[in-house]
């Protein structure tokens, strides 16, 4: 899913995601354009509170993925200010970006697992890249395998896994480093409803440990399953007032 759209029309801020209080994430008048095209995200201003649960909703092409890319520092904005953990990351030297990225877990829509590595080795990658001692890596991987229910698949290769199993591997890999923020792009888009519920339970348990969750989805039924979550609805590159979105939720994958 590639963020897109234009930025015509009125400008509304998402309720519950805007305020003067400093948060773990702050966007101020952020805009993004690719190349010489029109802006795909326009005048985004919001603050996310540490430990909260957020859904980013909107139609395909609304700009959800583009927003997530800026959150996990894969994309710099064209204009505006972004602060993560109290630091201006727009002007952050590239040499410091990896240190910030280690504080942010990412679950990609297409999983991005390494096909020739086992499930256990895929999950271990972030810790090994960070130079963690191997004994600690093994213990952490064992814990993650149990958490996502894949202990008996530790030596399997990703191509032999179902879509739901691959997604659980991706989640375990994203959280093994105990990130302060977890960003997930359509994490339930390739699984059935039963697996979607299981993944949501994993996210909720992680949020219960204090991790800030930002999940992009077009599955409206997910919104009603996490009553405490706040909603950031994007339409044509702008944040809109989500009031009433849950009163008459459309069907799954609306």
Where do the model's predicted regions map?
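A short, proline-enriched helix->beta-strand linker immediately N-terminal to the Walker B motif
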Residues: 176-180
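Catalytic Walker B motif of ABC-type/P-loop ATPase nucleotide-binding domains
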Residues: 182-185
């Amino acid at each position: 899913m590639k963020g897109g759209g234009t930025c015509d029309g009125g400008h509304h801020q998402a309720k519950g995601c805007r305020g003067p209080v400093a948060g773990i994430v702050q966007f101020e008048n952020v805009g993004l354009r690719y190349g010489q095209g029109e802006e795909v995200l326009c005048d985004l201003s919001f603050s996310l509170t540490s430990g909260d649960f957020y859904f980013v909703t909107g139609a395909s092409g609304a700009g959800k993925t583009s927003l997530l890319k800026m959150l996990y520092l894969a994309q710099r904005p064209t204009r505006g200010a972004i602060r993560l953990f109290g630091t201006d990351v727009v002007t952050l030297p590239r040499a410091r970006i990896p240190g910030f990225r280690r504080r942010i877990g990412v679950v990609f829509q297409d999983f991005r697992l390494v096909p020739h590595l086992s499930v256990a080795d895929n999950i271990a990658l972030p810790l090994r890249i960070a130079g963690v001692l191997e004994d600690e890596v093994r213990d952490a991987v064992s814990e993650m395998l149990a958490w996502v229910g894949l202990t008996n698949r530790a030596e399997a290769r990703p191509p032999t896994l179902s879509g739901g199993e691959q997604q659980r591997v991706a989640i375990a890999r994203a959280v093994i480093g105990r990130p302060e923020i977890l960003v997930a792009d359509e994490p339930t888009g390739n699984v059935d409803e039963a697996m979607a519920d299981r993944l949501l339970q994993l996210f909720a348990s992680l949020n219960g440990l204090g991790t800030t969750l930002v999940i992009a989805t077009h599955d409206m039924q997910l919104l009603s399953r996490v009553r405490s979550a706040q909603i950031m609805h994007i339409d044509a590159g702008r944040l809109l007032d989500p009031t009433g979105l849950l009163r008459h939720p459309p069907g799954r994958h609306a």
